[in-house]
């Protein structure tokens, strides 16, 4: 009975140590696991950032009016906030 307990204890310790050792042995300890992530500069602009467009505001804040209907948001209002 003691022999079976010692064998089970040795086998479990072997399994526990191989769980940490084998991945580094087969996959390499110096492999970059975050290869898909690129670290960018904090102040660098985002490449997928859209340009600001006045039509975006007209579509968001008011529907485009017909012939005589005024817009709920006019692109001329940009000069009040953005100085353009």
Swiss-Prot record:
Keywords: Amidation, Cleavage on pair of basic residues, Neuropeptide, Secreted, Signal. Residues 1-19 form the signal peptide. The modification Phenylalanine amide is found at residues 61, 82. It is found in: Secreted. It comes from the Eukaryota. GO terms for biological process: neuropeptide signaling pathway. Coiled coil: none annotated. Its main location: secreted. GO terms for cellular component: extracellular region. Each flp gene is expressed in a distinct set of neurons. The keyword Signal applies. Residues 20-48 form a propeptide. The keyword Signal applies. FMRFamides and FMRFamide-like peptides are neuropeptides. Belongs to the FARP (FMRFamide related peptide) family. This is FMRFamide-like neuropeptides 26. It comes from Caenorhabditis elegans.
């Amino acid at each position: 009975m003691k022999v079976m307990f010692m064998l089970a204890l040795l086998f479990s310790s072997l399994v526990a140590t191989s769980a940490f050792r084998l991945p580094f042995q087969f996959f390499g300890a110096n492999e970059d696991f975050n290869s898909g992530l690129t670290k960018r500069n904090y102040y660098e602009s985002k490449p997928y950032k859209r340009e600001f467009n006045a039509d975006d505001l007209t579509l968001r804040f008011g529907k485009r009016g017909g012939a005589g209907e005024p817009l709920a948001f006019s692109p001329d209002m940009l000069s009040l906030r953005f100085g353009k």
